[in-house]
UniProtKB/Swiss-Prot annotation:
Zinc-binding protein that binds only one zinc ion. The lineage of its organism: Archaea, Methanobacteriati, Methanobacteriota, Methanomada group, Methanococci. It comes from the Archaea. InterPro entries: HVO_2753-like, HVO_2753-like_ZBP. Contains four C(P)XCG motifs, suggesting the presence of two zinc binding pockets (ZBPs), but only ZBP2 (comprised of C(P)XCG motifs 2 and 4) is occupied by zinc. Monomer in solution. A motif (C(P)XCG motif 2) lies at residues 26-30. GO terms for molecular function: metal ion binding. Keywords: Metal-binding, Zinc. This is Zinc finger protein MJ0458.1. A motif (C(P)XCG motif 3) lies at residues 37-41. A motif (C(P)XCG motif 1) lies at residues 8-12. A motif (C(P)XCG motif 4) lies at residues 49-53.
Length: 57
């Protein structure tokens, strides 16, 4: 099986295996895993949950 690839929800960049990214459930609905790259985390780039529309920094 291949390694799971993650994409940043803010910038759509593929996340490198050793990058300091983060993954967490949507704070509002909890049904979608939000994945953010290190750059977007540091710059507080916004993201939007595709399921419920919640927007976060």
């Amino acid at each position: 099986m291949g390694e799971m690839k993650y994409v940043c929800i803010s910038c759509n960049a593929e996340i490198a295996p050793r990058e300091k990214s983060t993954k967490f459930p949507c704070p509002n609905c909890g049904e979608v895993e939000i994945v953010r790259c290190e750059r977007c985390r540091k710059l507080n780039n916004p993201y939007k949950c595709p399921k419920c529309g919640f927007e976060g920094p």
